[in-house]
Amino acid sequence: AASDVYKRQDYIVQVDDETKRQQSFDCEYDPSLTGETTIPVKALDPAPLNAKKVIARRAALLLLNMSNEAVINLGIGIPELVSSVANEEGIGDSLTMTVEAGAIGGVPLGGVRFGASVNAEAYMDQATQFDFYDGGGLDLTCLGLAECDKDGNINVSKFGTRIAGCGGFVNITQNTKNVVFCGTFTTGKLREEIKDGELHITQEGKVKKFVPEVGHITFSGNYARKHKQHVLYITERAVFEMKEDGVHLTEIAPGVDLQKDVLDQMGFKPIIDDVKLMPAFLF
């Protein structure tokens, strides 16, 4: 009977097989993920230098201008690397990094450990974490970039007939003052080379991310403009900023050809005023 559902109980089951009781996909138990112990954050391995790390480095530059009381959210994918870069540069513990699973403070991890944080100061249940996000508690968020159009809209939820869903994307972006979307400029067998402080495209991606109109609006550019949010779109070869009159191209990577590598790979023409080079030290 339906009423029997409410009579069910939870159980604690002892499991001797270590492979079936792992704390995360790649380890049995790490006490630094529970607050039982802390570890020197310098012991964490830095991410290898590639296009994704360049994007994370550019996003991490924004953290330098934030107060020590700033609260940051990091999404899955390339945004995961922002905490790694911040930690590598020695600024990770000066800000409060959070992830939607409930970790507050510490160094959020990526890959198969996404959702956990080393040396977290606190853990909340996910619903409470989202109450905090919904209430405007975040100063900045870094999230993924799958599709972007001329109005600054972002799609991460629907691609053709495939519905990925928005997850917490909408909650996180609606009331956050500074929103940063991070992703490679194109995708699908994209190959790039980083050498001598420059970026070179050796094989262009088959799929364009900057399109005339996104297939689904997960983030509304018009809503962001109405509510005076500061929005950046950071890729490995170009940086864009949303302004009142549309999406502006503000930076390109050294070594990149503006026409061939940027404008020709876009489904719309951004507003171009004063384009600067991305800092060479990012590469």
Go through each PLM region and give its residues:
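N-terminal active-site beta-alpha-beta segment that forms phosphate/nucleotide-binding
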Residues: 39-122
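Conserved phosphate- and dinucleotide-binding cores of soluble alpha/beta proteins
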Residues: 1-40, 111-283
